[in-house]
């Protein structure tokens, strides 16, 4: 099992599992700094499962806010827009949607994510 870095920016890193687990060909690990958001997406065909490996996050969906800490998991049903805010530095493991599904963004939720990240980045400077 190997991790491949696929993206790194001011929020942290995103890596994916590149060997094994053929049932879920994309297993992604998000390392996110406190105060920043990830996501703003929607997956049309697959549910998404997540588990917090380190830290504290809050998942946001149209159904509400869901606080998660180390060891807790969450399932996001298909067709549910979502994002998470990292309350502390965090590491989140997610799996389920295929790579092509992960590309679709939900316009309203993505706008929220971009605004929060912009405000946080401005505040840090």
Language-model segments: residues:
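Glycine- and acidic-residue-biased ligand/ion/polar-headgroup-sensing regions
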Residues: 45-58
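Conserved short histidine dyad/triad with adjacent acidic residue
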Residues: 28-44
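Structural motif
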Residues: 56, 81, 89-91
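Short acidic-glycine-tyrosine-enriched beta hairpin
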Residues: 62-81
């Amino acid at each position: 099992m190997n991790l491949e870095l696929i993206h790194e920016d001011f929020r942290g890193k995103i890596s994916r599992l590149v060997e094994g687990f053929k049932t879920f060909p994309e297993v992604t690990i998000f390392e996110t700094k406190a105060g920043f958001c990830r996501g703003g997406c929607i997956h049309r065909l697959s549910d998404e499962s997540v588990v917090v490996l380190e830290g504290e996050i809050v998942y946001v969906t149209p159904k509400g806010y869901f606080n998660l800490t180390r060891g807790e998991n969450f399932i996001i049903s298909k067709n549910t827009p979502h994002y998470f805010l990292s309350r502390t530095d965090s590491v989140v493991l997610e799996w389920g949607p295929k790579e092509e599904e992960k590309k679709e963004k939900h316009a309203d939720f993505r706008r929220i994510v971009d605004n929060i990240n912009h405000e946080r980045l401005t505040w840090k400077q």
